[in-house]
């Protein structure tokens, strides 16, 4: 798909500001006033004169599309006017960093009505506050600089703006979906390039370098999260990030990695054989996980209850593990006992957007039901949301051993058969899915058919 055509226009910041304002008015009838947000400030590395890697504050970006550090924005709820404040020229820094973005350039680049410099912020706030009787200033706690003052505003609300942005971010517009799609295009190609290189390198770190280089060379300079490049049994560790172990003697590689496109994330996982050919045990587990993913995706559309889809994934896993003989007994009893959590301990997926684990979802990490404790999304899925579908099966001794020592669970686990699967490590397959009124759109194009992956690896 040609996402570039959609992305030729400006990021729809004012549309987002309207949605946020409408949410506030829905909660506070007749609400009036100003939304105030700050971009992330430049930060220095501790005990060093170099800057930390910059990552724009997502709340600010949602209402501006502006990637500049040390910037502010005001959105007038009544007039719908958005004013962006960017850093002025600092003559002392020009020799080192060059000229910054000018007000004229900023007005051309981003969906705002006026651009001023940050040294005008307090005077502008004072003028706006004095001209609006009984107006409220809406801001986010701990995201207001000490030098910024709201003295002229009769009322200040620090409780609803963050909530309003987090809720409205769940449903994406066409532009946002194109951003996630663009990140997926680049990252999918990077995943396939890693598959082509896997037989020709000796260490996980070399494959991480391949992925990063492909993303950066195609414009995805930042990663959405720390890449997981896990060979062999390391793939049973969900968030393994050492990425520094040799590949020799190991069966499979689990690659969980995704680049960003202008602050929007991709989150993709593929698992494939290091030598280009799945073992019998690895292929059996892969086929179960792929079935889990495909059948779960097939059920998705607006209004589907995510908890039910997660349950379906466990049912498919149980059926598959019973067929292999790893599990034994009645499948309904196994489901009720939650024994399948030993092999599939995490949730089926999470919302995706500007953050990898995006806002919304209503997770309940205190849930006493272990099958749902780590499910990051609960309840119905709205059209326009983007969610990952990432089932997995893992053979982690540390996790499974307590189940083997508990009669409640051990009665359903066939230890002699299980022992043949430890070297499989873990298998996870993850795609990024747009929920529509009648179905889905899969943004992830990286190959996942096991025969195709084997051919791709062999072709290199």
From Swiss-Prot:
Pfam families in the cross-refs: AMP_N (PF05195), Peptidase_M24 (PF00557)
Catalyzed chemical reaction(s): Release of any N-terminal amino acid, including proline, that is linked to proline, even from a dipeptide or tripeptide
Listed GO biological process terms: proteolysis
GO function term, MF aspect, one: manganese ion binding
Binding annotation for Mn(2+) 1: 267, 390, 430
Residue positions binding Mn(2+) 2: 256, 267, 430
InterPro entries documented for this protein: Aminopep_P_N (IPR007865), Creatin/AminoP/Spt16_N (IPR029149), Creatinase/aminopeptidase-like (IPR036005), Pept_M24 (IPR000994), X-Pro_dipept-like (IPR052433)
Origin superkingdom: Eukaryota
Cofactor mode of binding and number, as noted: Binds 2 manganese ions per subunit.
Enzyme Commission numbers on file: 3.4.11.9
EC supergroup of this enzyme: hydrolase
Cofactor(s) demanded: Mn(2+)
Keywords for the protein's UniProt record, in alphabetical order: Aminopeptidase, Hydrolase, Manganese, Metal-binding, Metalloprotease, Protease
Family recorded in the similarity comment: Belongs to the peptidase M24B family.
Function description: Catalyzes the removal of a penultimate prolyl residue from the N-termini of peptides.
Name of the molecule in the record: Probable Xaa-Pro aminopeptidase PEPP
Organism listed in the record: Podospora anserina (strain S / ATCC MYA-4624 / DSM 980 / FGSC 10383) (Pleurage anserina)
């Amino acid at each position: 798909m040609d996402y570039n055509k959609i992305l030729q226009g400006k990021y729809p910041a004012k549309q987002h500001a309207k949605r946020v304002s409408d949410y506030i008015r829905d909660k506070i009838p007749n609400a009036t006033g100003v939304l105030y947000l700050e971009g992330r400030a430049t930060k220095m590395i501790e005990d060093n004169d170099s800057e930390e890697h910059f990552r724009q504050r997502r709340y600010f970006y949602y209402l501006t599309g502006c990637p500049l550090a040390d910037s502010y924005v005001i959105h007038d709820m009544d007039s719908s006017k958005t004013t962006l404040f960017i850093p002025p020229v600092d003559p002392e820094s020009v020799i080192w960093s060059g000229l910054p973005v000018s007000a004229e350039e900023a007005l051309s680049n981003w969906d705002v009505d006026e651009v001023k410099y940050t040294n005008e912020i307090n005077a502008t706030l004072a003028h706006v506050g004095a001209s609006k009787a009984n107006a409220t200033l809406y801001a986010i706690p701990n995201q207001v600089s000490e030098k910024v003052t709201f003295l002229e505003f009769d009322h200040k609300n620090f409780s609803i703006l963050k909530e309003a942005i987090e809720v409205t971010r769940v449903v994406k517009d066409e532009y946002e979906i194109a951003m996630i799609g663009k990140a997926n295009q680049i990252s999918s190609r990077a995943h396939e390039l890693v598959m082509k290189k896997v037989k020709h390198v000796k260490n996980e770190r070399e494959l991480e370098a391949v992925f990063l280089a492909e993303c950066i060379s195609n414009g995805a300079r930042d990663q959405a999260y720390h890449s997981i490049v896990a060979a062999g049994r390391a793939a049973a560790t969900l968030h393994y990030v050492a990425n520094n172990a040799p590949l020799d003697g190991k069966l499979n590689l689990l690659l969980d990695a995704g680049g960003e496109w202008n602050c929007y994330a991709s989150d993709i996982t593929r698992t494939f054989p290091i030598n280009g050919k799945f073992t019998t045990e690895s292929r059996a587990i892969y086929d179960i996980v792929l079935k889990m993913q495909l059948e779960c995706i097939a059920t998705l559309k607006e209004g589907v209850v995510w908890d039910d889809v997660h349950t379906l994934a466990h049912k498919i896993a149980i059926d598959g593990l019973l067929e292999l003989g790893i599990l034994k007994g009645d499948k309904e009893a196994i489901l009720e006992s939650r024994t399948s959590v030993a092999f599939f301990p995490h949730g089926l997926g999470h919302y995706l957007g500007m953050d990898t684990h995006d806002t919304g979802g209503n997770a309940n990490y205190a849930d006493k039901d272990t099958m749902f404790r780590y499910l990051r999304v609960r309840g119905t899925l709205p059209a326009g949301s983007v969610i990952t579908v990432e089932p997995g099966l893992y053979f982690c001794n540390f996790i499974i051993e307590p189940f083997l020592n508990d009669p409640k669970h051990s009665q359903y686990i066939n230890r002699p058969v299980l022992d043949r699967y430890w070297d499989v490590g873990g298998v996870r397959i993850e795609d990024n899915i747009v929920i529509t009124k009648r179905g889905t759109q899969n943004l992830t194009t990286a190959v996942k058919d096991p025969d195709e992956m084997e051919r791709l690896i062999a072709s290199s």
